[in-house]
Regions:
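Periplasmic-binding protein-like
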Residues: 58, 137-145, 208, 212-253, ...
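Extended ligand-binding regions for polar small-molecule ligands
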Residues: 21-23, 31-32, 77-78, 82, ...
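Short helix-initiation/N-cap motifs at beta->coil->alpha
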Residues: 39, 94-106, 149, 184-194, ...
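Acidic, polar ligand-binding/catalytic clefts
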Residues: 81, 93-156
């Protein structure tokens, strides 16, 4: 009987040791898997996914819009395709995520996109929430109005309604500097322009580069107030702290500067919309901005 108890104790001991060994092996495997996940770079994840997720506009020609064939077009799209080509070897490996101005920051924070290329103006407030790469456009706030009653100064907006798209630098600028001006706000950019055409406001404030194009293609309207505030820059944005992708983008953009890529993109996408009155160097950036 003592021998049987001894055998049982030995068997039980073997089972306990085996269970401990399996547990240690599982823990080691989990730790190794976690370590591999933690060390996997952001760029490796994009390459493994096989597509670059880019936030763009669908209703802001000539910068970002969807054409009659349902294809994304515009100045921002030309840049997105080049980034995808240099990062993934194929300009078509892009998942376009359509956005409105007020949603751009949240898309990055929630990891729904890798890069925002939606005409994103650099501001100190935004730079606290996202990281901006080198710029590829320069812009100021402008005001477009009807030719029959042009607005050429902020003083002329007193007692009138100014249309602004929500989440734009134009909205912020007027709320901060001219709170007495009555703002009529719209979620979508195309809605804002339709409101101006319908007479639901006396003028519309937005990036002047966009207004030059819109007025050129909409007879009866003029950008009589082309510049307000300081000159701003438009740049790609990545999630705050995404240093690896930010550094890759900066190197990429510096290479594009050397190629005069943005001037060529202007000639292809913006010049036909702007006409001959606006020159490339008034809009594009081809060198680092300190």
């Amino acid at each position: 009987m003592k021998k049987i108890y001894s055998y049982l104790l030995i068997a039980l001991l073997i089972l306990v040791l085996a269970a401990c060994n399996n547990s240690n092996n599982n823990e080691s495997a989990n730790e190794e898997e976690t370590a591999q996940t933690e060390t996997k770079s952001v760029i490796d994840e994009i390459k493994e996914r096989g597509v670059l997720r880019v936030a763009v506009f669908s209703d802001k020609p000539p910068f970002g819009y969807v054409d009659e064939k349902g294809e994304n077009q515009g100045y921002d799209i030309v840049l997105a395709k080049r980034i995808a080509k240099d990062l993934l070897g194929d300009e078509s490996k892009i998942e376009y995520v359509i956005t409105e101005p007020q949603a751009r920051v949240d898309l990055l924070k929630s990891d729904k996109v890798d890069i925002v290329l939606a005409n994103f103006t650099v501001t100190p407030e935004r730079a606290e929430q996202v990281d901006f790469a080198h710029p590829y456009m320069k812009v100021a706030i402008g005001v477009v109005s009807a030719e029959k009653s042009p607005i050429s100064s902020v003083e002329e907006l007193k007692g009138k309604k100014l249309i602004v798209p929500k989440g734009t630098t134009a909205e912020t600028f007027f709320m901060k500097n001219y709170p007495e001006v009555e703002l009529v706000k719209y979620d979508q950019i195309n809605e804002a322009f339709e409101a101006l055409k319908d007479g639901r406001g006396d003028a519309l404030a937005q990036d002047n580069a966009l207004l030059f194009s819109w007025a050129n293609n909409n007879p009866g309207f003029t950008v009589a107030l082309p510049t307000l505030g300081e000159l701003d820059y438009i740049a790609p944005a990545v999630k705050k702290g995404n240093t690896e992708l930010l550094e890759w983008l900066n190197v990429e953009i510096e290479k594009l500067y050397e190629e005069k890529f943005f001037t060529k993109a202007y000639e292809e996408t913006l010049k036909p919309a702007f006409g001959e009155t606006i020159k490339a160097d008034a809009v594009v950036v081809e060198s680092k901005v300190e």
